[in-house]
Amino acid sequence: MVDYHAANQSYQYGPSSGSNGAGGGGTMGDYMAQEDDWDRDLLLDPAWEKQQRKTFTAWCNSHLRKAGTQIENIDEDFRDGLKLMLLLEVISGERLPKPERGKMRVHKINNVNKALDFIASKGVKLVSIGAEEIVDGNAKMTLGMIWTIILRFAIQDISVEETSAKEGLLLWCQRKTAPYKNVNVQNFHISWKDGLAFNALIHRHRPELIEYDKLRKDDPVTNLNNAFEVAEKYLDIPKMLDAEDIVNTARPDEKAIMTYVSSFYHAFSGAQKAETAANRICKVLAVNQENEHLMEDYERLASDLLEWIRRTIPWLEDRVPQKTIQEMQQKLEDFRDYRRVHKPPKVQEKCQLEINFNTLQTKLRLSNRPAFMPSEGKMVSDINNGWQHLEQAEKGYEEWLLNEIRRLERLDHLAEKFRQKASIHEAWTDGKEAMLKHRDYETATLSDIKALIRKHEAFESDLAAHQDRVEQIAAIAQELNELDYYDSHNVNTRCQKICDQWDALGSLTHSRREALEKTEKQLETIDQLHLEYAKRAAPFNNWMESAMEDLQDMFIVHTIEEIEGLISAHDQFKSTLPDADREREAILAIHKEAQRIAESNHIKLSGSNPYTTVTPQIINSKWEKVQQLVPKRDHALLEEQSKQQSNEHLRRQFASQANIVGPWIQTKMEEIGRISIEMNGTLEDQLSHLKQYERSIVDYKPNLDLLEQQHQLIQEALIFDNKHTNYTMEHIRVGWEQLLTTIARTINEVENQILTRDAKGISQEQMQEFRASFNHFDKDHGGALGPEEFKACLISLGYDVENDRQGDAEFNRIMSVVDPNHSGLVTFQAFIDFMSRETTDTDTADQVIASFKVLAGDKNFITAEELRRELPPDQAEYCIARMAPYQGPDAVPGALDYKSFSTALYGESDL
């Protein structure tokens, strides 16, 4: 006889859901005792026997096909015991003793006894079933034995709300078919004759396979065939009964129906487990993939930013000087373009990088994953260090550019200064030689000679004054030579020409003075009068010009005191006008006296005073102008006085309202701070109270609008200060915005606490206890605890973190969870996250391993085909690409290790 173990050694099966021995859902004796009532009539009805044969044969073949074989005749094919032992191995997932190879009756009996002993070892009492009857092909005993196997391995573990196997299966059917019309499952015979119950079970779990609304209760054959064909085609449940056998039997066989229905139960319960396991894996993988994308984005952004810094620093450290200011200015323009165009996006990238890093760490912490550690050299601190190096190089580069530009500007300034002074000097000397050589004094009158002498004296003074300019020109030329100015040759040529011309002017000046002194005579009186006129006319003319400027000066005042000061000064000015008028008349009298002397002595005057250009006509014209401006000034000052009085009224009006609104805002800010600390009642009560408080604040807005209207009037009046109040409109606006922001932030904090409480299943009492403990140790009300404050808070909540080695280790572990960035502060949200993790369940690596084990059919490995069948395509490929090959002794080609993959997801091993 062929050894079936050797023939099927390539097939290995994991234990099924019903292979846990006698310990699943009650003892075998209990349900067998219950089944005694079902087997009272040992003489099978022929119709029932036919149904049992077909059902039991199909049920056995549904399992034997896994081992590559099947049976045709149920009471013949099990006689040698070989396929019976193989069936038990497949459905139990356990090895039976090695079968005997002989073909004699004794060998067959021994093989059947091995199978019966295995059944008995599972707690099954075999009543009146012996190996000899099975070997002899006793149909009744064979069907009874198969029914016992079905009960033990397919129905026993079905338990709904602690019911027995049969009752549990019936209750499951009733619940699944309850929503369907014309279906009322009360038993496992009559309730199934019309086929609607079978169709309802399929539609409940796979609605796309059955159009239930089109089925008719009066067409049972069609209904049954439809259900059996769909189950065989799409659910892998073989056809165990014929529709005609069920319909043509007054009471279908209960065992056959139970066997058929149990196949539906196992098909749908297995699919549900697989779906649950797949959903759990998908959820875990989705979180892991999202985190990996964030990590990749961080690495890419960090690399790009560090590369940009690496390229930019050498450019900023380049200190090669240029020869011209235009070249240096181009460098400065490039630097400004860098500051204006290139750097700001990088500043934004750096900020976004830090935000992404913090967001990633938060997501990892919330999903119970290890903290993200960037590649070496790409930490946030590394980027900050590189950025500081960039800033230092940038600062030094700017200083160097400015120093170089200042140096070149000094050279250009010196050269320009030389050109300007040289041009002024050359313009001044233009015509001077011709003037000094002119012999106009030979035919001049006495007054002309006097004028020429004075003019020559003035020229000599001017000449002496220009001596400094000539010396400066020479000094600048010397400095340009020392600094190696590129145009030194032209500078030296021009400087030499100026010096030669200067010497010639000195010689000509001396000669002309000697000639004028020889002719200096006559008529000093007229000359003295002209001089006296000039001395007094010039100051008086200046006084009138200053007075006209003051009278026409635009004044800007902001207070009544300032305008009253201007009015007082103007009154004082008007009191000086009589004295000024007398001075004017005295000056005009001097001019008239000179005219009288010249006429009486027949002296021909040149017509103008040689000492001044201020004529009597100019003095009279300006005096009339002053007389006209005085009343205009009076009118303007009075108008301004009226305006300032109106402004003072606006100031007082604004101050009165501001001194009410400002303290109100400050009081509300203090009350919000107190409310956020006390936080009495439930979170919902706190939220409701805060929102009512927010509405009371919003209702106060009309007072602020009134203040805005008053402020608008002040702005239109160009009033810039107000001594009647310390509150400015900007101060009020900032306070108002801070008030709205504070109440909104406080409301948001409570809403987040509610979300955290609901998401983590934290009770109201726990949340209040957490808030009370946190507030108690938050001494400065800053919203965060330091390490010592946090430790004291944990101790108050019962955590063993005392000052010993074990307590310190536990505290350091907790700090690494709540403060992964080592900032030294623990926020209330981080505190709540930690406490919620400590008090609620989270997904673990063991849960993921258990889920994969379900998908793998309880094997220690999983195949790519199984992953693609149970998971979405993208996540299936993700797992296949990352799972290591399985190396266990039971490995098959293509086996993948899902255990190491699952632990790697949670940082417990390397992926």
UniProtKB/Swiss-Prot annotation:
This is Alpha-actinin-4. Residues 1-269 are annotated as: Actin-binding. Residues 50-154, 163-269 form the Calponin-homology (CH) domain. InterPro entries: Actinin_actin-bd_CS, CH_dom, CH_dom_sf, EF-hand-dom_pair, EF-hand_Ca_insen, EF_Hand_1_Ca_BS, EF_hand_dom, Spectrin/alpha-actinin. GO terms for biological process: actin cytoskeleton organization; muscle cell development; peroxisome proliferator activated receptor signaling pathway; protein transport; retinoic acid receptor signaling pathway. Spectrin repeats lie at residues 293-403, 413-518, 528-639, 649-752. Residues 177-192 are annotated as: Polyphosphoinositide (PIP2)-binding. The modification Phosphoserine is found at residues 696, 909. One of its GO terms (molecular function) is calcium ion binding. Residues 736-911 are annotated as: Mediates interaction with MICALL2. Residues 8-31 are annotated as: Disordered. Residues 765-800, 806-841 form the EF-hand domain. SUPFAM superfamilies: Calponin-homology domain, CH-domain (SSF47576), EF-hand (SSF47473), Spectrin repeat (SSF46966). Residues 12-26, 40-61, 108-126 are annotated as: Interaction with VCL. The modification Phosphotyrosine is found at residue 31. The modification Phosphothreonine is found at residue 249. The gene is ACTN4. The modification N6-acetyllysine is found at residues 114, 214, 592, 625, 779, 859. Ca(2+) binds at residues 778, 780, 789. Its main location: nucleus.
